[in-house]
Regions:
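Post-transcriptional modification and biogenesis factors for structured RNAs
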Residues: 1-180
Length: 180
C-alpha cells in the first residue's frame, strides 16, 4: 500500500479511550499518532498492551491553532455533521490524518475548518471513539490495501489479491540510427 496515515483525537479525557485508539492505530500500522487540546497526558494511556506509545511517533498540540501536519497530508475529520461524506462513499487520500472527537464533544469549529474532508460512519447514533477508529481504519485498509473483489456467493472466498507492483528498467524509445 502506498502513502501513509496518522490518527489523532481532539480533547480526549479518558485514559482507556486514548489507549484503545492508540492500540488500534498501531494495529493498522499508522505512521504517527497525535492529540489536539488533550485533557490528559500520554503517560495516562496505560490501557495499551501493544506498547503503541513506544512504537508510534506521538505529537501533542495544546490548542487547535498549534496543530500542524506534514506537507501534502490531508486532514479527515470523523464527525456526524449534515454535510459529512458517508464512509462507504469516501475515497481515502493516499496521505491522510484522521482526527476523531472526544467522548462527550464534537470536533471543534477550528479543527472542522482545518479538515480537507469530513466523513461520518452511517450509524443511528454516536459510537465510542476507539470503535469509530477501528471502523475507519478497516475501511481504509479494505479500500486501499490491494484486496481482491468480494465474492458473489455468501461465505465464498474473494478474488485473487493483485501482486505487488514491481518496477522494471526505465522504458525508452529506440533511437533511429539511420544516417540522415
Amino acid at each position: 500500500m502506498r502513502g501513509y496515515f496518522g490518527v489523532g483525537v481532539e480533547g480526549v479525557s479518558k485514559p482507556m479511550n486514548l489507549g484503545n485508539l492508540m492500540r488500534i492505530a498501531h494495529a493498522f500500522e499508522a505512521s504517527f499518532f497525535f492529540s489536539v487540546a488533550p485533557r490528559l497526558k500520554l503517560s495516562d494511556a496505560n490501557s495499551d498492551s501493544s506498547n503503541a506509545e513506544g512504537a508510534l511517533p506521538f505529537y501533542s498540540f495544546p490548542h487547535p491553532d498549534d496543530f500542524r501536519l506534514p506537507l501534502g497530508c490531508r486532514l479527515v475529520g470523523v464527525e456526524i455533521t449534515e454535510d459529512a461524506i458517508e464512509l462507504p462513499r469516501f475515497r481515502h487520500p493516499t496521505r491522510a490524518a484522521y482526527v476523531f472527537g472526544a467522548e462527550r464533544f464534537s470536533l471543534s469549529p477550528a479543527i472542522l475548518k482545518a479538515c480537507d474532508f469530513v466523513v461520518k460512519i452511517p450509524t443511528r447514533f454516536s459510537i465510542n471513539v476507539g470503535m469509530a477508529g477501528a471502523i475507519v481504519l478497516y475501511d481504509r485498509l479494505i479500500s486501499t490495501g490491494g484486496y481482491g473483489a468480494r465474492p458473489v456467493k455468501a461465505g465464498g472466498e474473494g478474488g485473487e489479491v493483485p501482486p505487488p507492483h514491481t518496477w522494471g528498467a526505465p522504458l525508452a524509445r529506440p533511437r533511429d540510427e539511420t544516417p540522415g
